Structures are given as structure tokens and as C-alpha cells.
């Protein structure tokens, strides 16, 4: 007679078998504006390597006809998929409403599935002219900055706090942010949604929740992936931020230059990069905000490095978060929290973290919770 233990073994085997099963996902795209009309090809960009890891021009769909494109691939059962359709760049994203960019399409793979996507517009078709920036407060632009070892120049945008021009004797802490085109202005944000950091910071400052800060957005480049990782280009990017961007900001604006008044924030690979900045250069950066950090990247290299670190505790503050619908990131987020605890970091003191159960990997959700690292880093004491 089968025992309870036997049933348990059978159940575990069944769960393992289900998780290892490969299921077929087919995505059909039928745009209203056809290739014959627009001269465009169709691409998919998303959270999986099969989707090109959010590269908008990496994975071209198979063209079946002038009005139909197809993507097919196998995925493990229960895989969480998140993607968008483009015509080769984020400036040519597929739209379903002429007034705004769509949120990511998501799918949990539980069976062989066919999705039909019917875009009504391509973004560049409805942008007849470049829209005016939509930013609260005063900003300065510094164009085409370059650094040793980097392949691309980039812009930075500097947001100044409300009292900056009136209180000419005051000096301010500085927050640096990766993916700078996405943080203030929806007209430059790659999905059409920005983080609204200008509005959030302005409100928190006027409510006297945080101290006044200068915010520096550093635009990304086509080398975003290696620049935001622990690599040769990543080291060159870090040196660029310190020796070019920070040097320019400190010489141009009234800043508090010490590490205690210098923070850095990013999301996804930018979240990974932010942790690398404070961990490798705690003499320069005293605070890091890591939203939806990609600790899985490069075979979890950063997780391993910090877990194996045996030196003195670094005097830094770290904020981490993750969304419940970011399946590939949850494990790394939770393990990093526990690793930092074992290194002596304490919640509410030099460590803070939050888990948003419905959060997805998108600017929309990062905008909703960016107030948390701002308060943790720059809250009035």
C-alpha cells in the first residue's frame, strides 16, 4: 500500500516535471499601419533573452505578409514574460492609444499560447514635431560628455532645487541617477513614461520631508548593458561618472561634495550598477538606491562578491526593492537583503527594502516608489 512518503515523492516529481516542461508561445502582430505603408519592420523587446533583454532592435519578427508578423519560442512552464512591440527603436514603439505609451504586455506561461497584438499606431507617426519638455523646476543640460574607455558620448541633465537661484550661499547634496532620459521628462523617456522624479522631489522638499538636493540624470548609451555591469566598460563608466560628471557638477554648482551627501539611484541593470558604485567606491558614494536590481546578471557575480566579502563593514546606506511580477528578480533581491543583513546592515539605519506585490518592471512602478529611496537617503533628520 502506498505510504504518505511515497505520495510526497510522486508529488515532488510531478512538480519538477511540470516546471521543466517546455511550452510553445506564439505572438502574432497585426498592425493597422503595414510595412507597405510605413517601410518598417517589427521587433519584440522584453525581459527574456529570447526577447533581446529589452533591446528594441534585436529580435526581428518573422514577416508572414504585409500585415502579419510572427514570433515563436519555447519557454519553461510558469515562466513570466514581459514585452513590448517596436518598429526598431523606442521612438517607434507600437501604440494602442495615440495619447500614451502602453504598459508592458505580460504573460505567465501555463500552456501552449497564441497572443494576437494589434497596434493602431507607431509612435513616430503621431509625433509630428518634437514636443516641449515637461519638467517641473529648472534644469540645465550638458551635452555630449565623453570619458576614457567609453565608446559613446552622452548628455546629462541637472535638476536644481527650488531655493537654488535665490539662496546663493547654500550648498546642496547631490543625487546621481542612471538612465537620465527616463527620470524627469516623458518626451525623452524611452517608453513615454518618466519617473516623475522632478515632481516627487519638489513635493517632498516643499513638504519638508527631505532636504533640498540637486539631481543629475546621466543618459544611457547603446552600451548600457556592459556599462551598468561589473565589466571593463562598467569600470570605465564608473570612472566617467566620478571623474567627468561629478567633477563637472561640483565645479559648476554649489554642492556638498563628501560621500555622506552623495547618492546614486538606478533601476534594473541601473540598480545593479548603483550597488556596484557604493560597494566599489564608498569613498565617493555614500548611498545607493537599487530599484528592481538585476542581480541575476553575469551569473550572479555581484551577489557572490558581496556574500564572500570578509573585510570591514563599508559605511554606506543601501535601499533595495522589487515587484511581485518581476519573477526573474525576486530571488536575487531577497538573497541580497539577507546577505547585507549578515554583513551588519540594519533596516531603518543603513538598509531599507520594500516588496511591492503587484509591481512590474516598468517606469510606471518605479515612479510610484521612488519617493522611498529619496526619503531614506535625504530625509530630514
Residue ranges with predicted function:
Residues 1-26:
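Bacterial Sec-dependent N-terminal signal peptides
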Amino acid at each position: 500500500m502506498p505510504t504518505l512518503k511515497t505520495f510526497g515523492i510522486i508529488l515532488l516529481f510531478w512538480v519538477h516535471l511540470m516546471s521543466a516542461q517546455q511550452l510553445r508561445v506564439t505572438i502574432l502582430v497585426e498592425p493597422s499601419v503595414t510595412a507597405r505603408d510605413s517601410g518598417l519592420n517589427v521587433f519584440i523587446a522584453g525581459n527574456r533573452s529570447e526577447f533581446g533583454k529589452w533591446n528594441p532592435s534585436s529580435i526581428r519578427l518573422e514577416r508572414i505578409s504585409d500585415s502579419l508578423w510572427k514570433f515563436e519560442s519555447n519557454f519553461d512552464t510558469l515562466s513570466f514574460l514581459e514585452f513590448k512591440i517596436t518598429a526598431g527603436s523606442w521612438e517607434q514603439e507600437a501604440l494602442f492609444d495615440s495619447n500614451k505609451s502602453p504598459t508592458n504586455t505580460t504573460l505567465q506561461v501555463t500552456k501552449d499560447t497564441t497572443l494576437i497584438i494589434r497596434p493602431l499606431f507607431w509612435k513616430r507617426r503621431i509625433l509630428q514635431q518634437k514636443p516641449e519638455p515637461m519638467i517641473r523646476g529648472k534644469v540645465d543640460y550638458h551635452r555630449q560628455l565623453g570619458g576614457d574607455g567609453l565608446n559613446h558620448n552622452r548628455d546629462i541633465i541637472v535638476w536644481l532645487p527650488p531655493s537654488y537661484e535665490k539662496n546663493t550661499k547654500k550648498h546642496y547634496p547631490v543625487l546621481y541617477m542612471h538612465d537620465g532620459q527616463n527620470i524627469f521628462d516623458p518626451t525623452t523617456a524611452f517608453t513615454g513614461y518618466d519617473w516623475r522624479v522632478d515632481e516627487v522631489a519638489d513635493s517632498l522638499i516643499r513638504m519638508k520631508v527631505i532636504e533640498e538636493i540637486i539631481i543629475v540624470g546621466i543618459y544611457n548609451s547603446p552600451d548600457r548593458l556592459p556599462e551598468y555591469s561589473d565589466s571593463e566598460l562598467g569600470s570605465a563608466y564608473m570612472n566617467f561618472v566620478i571623474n567627468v560628471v561629478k567633477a563637472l557638477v561640483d565645479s559648476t554648482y554649489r554642492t556638498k561634495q563628501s560621500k555622506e551627501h552623495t547618492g546614486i539611484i538606478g533601476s534594473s541593470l541601473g540598480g545593479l550598477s548603483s550597488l556596484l558604485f557604493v560597494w566599489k567606491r564608498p569613498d565617493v558614494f555614500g548611498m545607493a538606491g537599487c530599484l528592481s536590481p538585476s542581480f541575476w546578471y553575469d551569473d550572479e557575480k555581484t551577489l557572490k562578491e558581496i556574500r564572500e566579502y570578509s573585510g570591514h563593514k563599508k559605511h554606506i546606506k543601501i535601499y533595495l526593492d522589487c515587484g511581485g511580477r518581476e519573477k526573474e528578480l525576486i530571488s536575487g533581491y531577497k538573497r541580497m537583503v539577507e546577505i547585507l543583513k549578515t554583513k551588519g546592515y540594519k533596516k531603518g539605519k543603513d538598509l531599507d527594502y520594500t516588496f511591492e506585490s503587484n509591481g512590474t518592471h516598468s517606469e510606471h512602478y518605479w515612479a510610484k516608489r521612488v519617493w522611498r529611496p529619496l526619503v531614506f537617503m535625504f530625509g530630514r533628520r
